[in-house]
């Protein structure tokens, strides 16, 4: 007997069309079962089909979804989850048009967050991050990548990674940990970036032994780390058994996209300034282009990543919030979906695939997350919407009704608009 059976699902978005990364037309295709049903047992999906096919199934609880839509839990593959403080004091500078790199030089930007994170205890960081994770869950996210990078020293970086490990045990959302010690060059290492990177590399063996990080990332940008420094650093991390990511071409077109494809990074993120050659190389690689339009929006910039061109040329595109205290302080992945549709010229179908299938592959979770398939975790979202286009169309609010994580209700609105029923 099933534990739970969901019936009367108006649109069941399985996202289950083909294995591997989705590109071109596959990104613009959504497998939808009309009047669908999903069966759950021991936290695992055991039935996917139509309500007609589900007749005769026995379940301890049968939930009538009222003709509303059900999707997989969403995947946010790029966040800076664990940090201290906030940076609302920088809003005025941004409105005046002060460039981020200038704010950084004044001791603001990431350096401000670094100081607040250093001063916070691990438990304070955990409790703050739980608050943000709860919000992410309420927006339909069930898997999140979490970066360190607000320490720029060994003690604080360890503290961030240990906080993430504790959160993995204490919060329903699945977390994927990334070490971003190479997020900026500390003042004491100004002009000595190679020495700083070697210091970060020296931390990796113990980090690997303690399994505190799965990925290693670096901020490849003017005034921070060069393309050559980034490639050398990430290749050494790969030799130690880590998968790698790269903050690439966010501000200047340095060649970060090309570097990511060349070294086989799991993802290249931002890519606002990615060159035509970089896009071509990404299209011919298995590196996911994780686009972060919420950051461009919040920084009030006119030029967004060329998402339309990337998809048309065969790049596997994912979307993420880039949740962080400075350049994108939002946990709302649904808002990111809307911005991507409007500013990156992505279709609703492409947007949905970019926050499920491709985003899961960007963090090596393509075989366990992002799809509704028999044998996978029952990470499901019931939406207060009757079709998938409505979610990115009606922007600025959350359309989530209920979230199941491993078959258990992890979030629901104050009142449930569905009721239990029998077949």
From Swiss-Prot:
- Note the superkingdom of the native organism: Bacteria
- EC nos: 3.5.2.7
Q: Which residues bind N-formimidoyl-L-glutamate?
A: 150, 324, 326
Question: Which GO BP terms sit in this record?
Answer: L-histidine catabolic process to glutamate and formamide; L-histidine catabolic process to glutamate and formate
Cofactor(s) for this UniProt protein:
Zn(2+); Fe(3+)
Give the residues the record marks as binding Zn(2+).
78, 80, 247, 322
Protein's job: Catalyzes the hydrolytic cleavage of the carbon-nitrogen bond in imidazolone-5-propanoate to yield N-formimidoyl-L-glutamate. It is the third step in the universal histidine degradation pathway.
This one is known as Imidazolonepropionase
